[in-house]
Amino acid sequence: MRRNKSLWLFLLTLIVIAVASLFGPAERSLGTNVRLVYIHGAWVWTALIAFGAAAVAGIMGWLLSSQSLHTWSRALGQAGLFFWITYLPLSLWTMQANWNGLYLTEPRFRFAIDFAVIGILLQLAILILKKPRYTSLINMGYFAALWFSLARTEQVMHPPSPILSSNSLEIQFFFFTLLGLCVFALWWLSLWLRQRALERR
């Protein structure tokens, strides 16, 4: 029952996010299409937060020899992959709306696809191995590789941190509110995945 509650709260939070995104402040050059940029940015930041949290939980799991933390690492890694994969269609939608086309050779987009494929393969390996300590190692390695590669991926069409560089406090406030809602959704999804993993032991 508790596991189902977490899933329903996750789905409810997604609905709140969808509704909230409709009320984002317009921007001078992009108009109301900037609302896609808000959700697109908050979504991928949430994925990065999840991968980072999975790595931290993994490190702490190794240091403290904690099975519980290894399980959290697994759940956070899976939740992060959900946000990362679903970010891809959001990215395409944002491209089409704001750039009037799909620039599939954009380095940031190719990077996102590459790490989506790698993430899926690694999560499959985690499910096959069923070794909590290996799960944490994989999540630590994945996050390190992702962060290293992201820092070195060039930007062509993709602007560098458009929200943080904005002069509008209203835009920044709305974005971080939306990000908070996405992280809230991440929490419920991670909790559901953790409970599911514990039940399957």
Predicted feature residues:
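Polytopic transmembrane helical bundles with strong interfacial aromatic enrichment
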Residues: 1-201
